[in-house]
Amino acid sequence: MQEIQKNTKKEQYNLNKLQKRLRRNVGEAIADFNMIEEGDRIMVCLSGGKDSYTMLEILRNLQQSAPINFSLVAVNLDQKQPGFPEHILPAYLEPLGVEYKIVEENTYGIVKEKIPEGKTTCSLCSRLRRGILYRTATELGATKIALGHHRDDILQTLFLNMFYGGKMKGMPPKLMSDDGKHIVIRPLAYCREKDIVRFAEAKAFPIIPCNLCGSQPNLQRQVIADMLRDWDKRYPGRIETMFSAMQNVVPSHLCDTNLFDFKGITHGSEVVDGGDLAFDREEIPLQPAGWQPEEDDTSLEALRLDVIEVK
């Protein structure tokens, strides 16, 4: 009995620590990008997955202590996919006292009609879903639309665009919607997926499967996701360093003429961002930038990232 109580206390301690970290990550993202302002009405897009449940829970938590007032309304889109459990979200939200709206639109039927059997339906489905959510935001008087993409999603998108699209483009933490009428925010932008997975399991969220439509997953994104997970396992801190790099862009040391006026450089021009360090041996920090070992990560040793010495 004592052993059970001891385990329960430890689990609660770990959950509190995890929630505190997620809350800190979300709070920092909100502050850094001015995501939420006084009087905002936030439409929280709730799919029934681990990410959107976590986003709603952390925003509700922050709402109680934030120095500004803002309201939340959870919105779920019932796309009439076969087997969709309509009762789950109302049963979860009503006891919490969360305002919510279930929007019923048969996008599943439209997608099945337009996309050949066996092909990935995600692109068309997401466009239809986006339009419906924008319309719903207007109907509800929402000033912001919150999506549940996290740090790993942002990095995956960056590498997808670099590997397959030939451009350095990630997923913005805050943007103007396609119709030019709504501000979209991603409060989980600084949150690690593995933290969200652990939090969702500990909170026992009633997860709704994401593949009810039967669509095949995006294989390219899966390749990137597997690659990043492998890097994170073999080189602790590499993911944090790459995300930190997205926040420390040096246009003068890339090759985009739209970001930096290379043609304007003449004799006598000032040195920009250190000039040319390509021929100097740079000091590589033992601990990757942006990474701090956690209290419960005692099994991880600080590893130097692979460095190729150019002779």
UniProtKB/Swiss-Prot annotation:
Binding positions for [4Fe-4S] cluster per the UniProt entry: C122, C125, C213
Keyword check for Membrane: no
Pathway: tRNA modification
Cellular component annotations (GO), alphabetically ordered: cytoplasm
Cofactors that this protein relies on: Mg(2+); [4Fe-4S] cluster
InterPro entries documented for this protein: Rossmann-like_a/b/a_fold, TilS/TtcA_N, tRNA_Cyd_32_2_STrfase, tRNA_thiolation_TtcA_Ctu1
Note from the entry: The thiolation reaction likely consists of two steps: a first activation step by ATP to form an adenylated intermediate of the target base of tRNA, and a second nucleophilic substitution step of the sulfur (S) atom supplied by the hydrosulfide attached to the Fe-S cluster.
PANTHER family in UniProt: AMINOTRAN_5 DOMAIN-CONTAINING PROTEIN, SULFURTRANSFERASE-RELATED
Protein family (similarity comment): Belongs to the TtcA family.
Official protein name in the record: tRNA-cytidine(32) 2-sulfurtransferase
Species per Swiss-Prot/TrEMBL record: Salmonella paratyphi C (strain RKS4594)
